[in-house]
Each structure stands twice: as structure tokens, then as C-alpha cells.
Design a protein with these regions (language model features):
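An acidic-aromatic loop/edge-strand motif
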Residues: 1-9, 13-32, 92-183
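A cross-kingdom feature marking solvent-exposed beta-strand/loop segments within repeated
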Residues: 24, 28-34, 43, 52-54, ...
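Solvent-exposed, flexible loop/coil residues
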Residues: 36-39, 47
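Non-transmembrane functional regions of envelope-associated proteins
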Residues: 37, 68, 167
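Short solvent-exposed loop/turn micro-motifs enriched in small/polar/acidic residues
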Residues: 41, 58-60, 79-81, 171, ...
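Non-catalytic terminal accessory/regulatory regions of metabolic enzymes
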Residues: 44, 61, 74, 115-118, ...
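Conserved short histidine dyad/triad with adjacent acidic residue
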Residues: 45-51, 179
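Aromatic-lined ligand-binding clefts that engage carbohydrates, nucleic acids, or primary amines
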Residues: 54-68, 97, 178-184
Length: 184
């Protein structure tokens, strides 16, 4: 057997925002398959209506979703835990929402052969006022693909120097270097 080696701590010294990895953009709410992407991440953008009270966002996200409202992370939905809804704060004005959905693998046989990735079906936003329950289905979606490939990561780092992020989260690409002098 080969001997074990140790190497110095790796510092991730370069960063490119996830938006720098966007490959294609389409109007509407689309799955990975509709956007011709097998693996990776989809960034969905929509403006949510004003709600005077907290609201519940309900969706079927395959497989893991992070939800940002007004640039702040408000929650996550994990398909493996059967999570399909989360509480949003009251929105006193129309507010931009970004939903990042990661596909976590494929099953390529049997009844799971049609395991579509991304947001599946409609999204509803449910709130209430003094007299009734109100259900919204946002329709002005933008779907952006971020393929999970080495080439796309390199493109993201090239774009990053000119990118000015407008939302406050550090989802993205990180890169560091290490020199290993001895094989192990």
C-alpha cells in the first residue's frame, strides 16, 4: 500500500458568485430537463406580491432548494425530508425572490426514471387578511441554468472580475491551490 501523506492547509483564495456560472436564461418556470440540463443548479427569480402578514410558500423542489427573499435567506426545502413549504415574513412591497435548486443525483431505472429536477409544477404563496385566505401563483418567472461542469466553473471565474453581486449571499465557486511534493 502507498504511505499516507499530509499536505498543508488549503486556502480558498478565489471566489466567483453563482450567477457568474449562468449558462442560459429562459422566461417562465422550467425544469432542468426543459432547459436541457442533466446535472447542476437552477436559479429561479420572481417578484412576490406584497402581503401584510406572513405567508406560506409551497412548492415541490427536486431536490434541494434555498429560498432568498429581498436578498436574505429565509429557508430551505429538502426533498429527502419531504419539505414542501416554508414560512415567509410579511412583505410590505413587491419583493424579489431567488430560489436556488440543486439536483442531487439521478435514478435511471424503474418507476423513478422520470425523476425531473428543479421546481416541479406550480408554486403557491398563501396568506390571509381579516376576511379570507389568499392564494397567489406567481407567473413572471425567470429560469437560469448553472451546469455542474469544470468548464462552466472556469467561465464563472473569468466573468467574476466584472461582476457586481446585487444580493448578499456567498453561494458560488471557490478555488484554492496546493502543491504536493510527495505522492502518497
Amino acid at each position: 500500500p502507498m504511505p499516507l501523506i499530509s499536505f498543508p492547509r488549503v486556502t480558498l483564495s478565489e471566489y466567483a458568485p453563482l450567477q457568474c456560472g449562468i449558462d442560459s436564461i429562459a422566461e417562465g418556470l422550467h425544469t432542468f430537463e426543459e432547459m436541457n440540463m442533466g446535472y447542476g443548479t437552477m436559479i429561479y427569480e420572481v417578484t412576490l406580491p406584497a402581503t401584510d402578514k406572513p405567508a406560506v410558500l409551497t412548492m415541490d423542489a427536486h431536490d434541494y432548494a434555498q429560498v432568498f427573499v429581498g436578498g436574505q435567506l429565509v429557508g430551505k426545502l429538502d426533498r429527502t425530508k419531504n419539505e414542501k413549504s416554508l414560512q415567509l415574513p410579511a412583505l410590505y412591497a413587491p419583493t424579489k425572490a431567488i430560489i436556488i435548486v440543486e439536483g442531487m443525483g439521478r435514478i435511471n431505472f424503474g418507476r423513478a426514471i422520470k425523476d425531473y429536477k428543479g421546481i416541479i409544477g406550480n408554486i403557491t404563496l398563501t396568506t390571509e387578511n381579516e376576511v379570507c385566505t389568499i392564494n397567489y401563483q406567481p407567473r413572471q418567472w425567470k429560469s437560469c441554468t448553472v451546469p455542474d461542469t469544470y468548464e462552466q466553473a472556469l467561465k464563472a471565474f473569468r466573468k467574476a472580475s466584472a461582476f457586481n453581486p446585487t444580493i448578499g449571499f456567498l453561494r458560488g465557486y471557490f478555488r484554492g491551490y496546493v502543491n504536493i511534493r510527495k505522492v502518497g
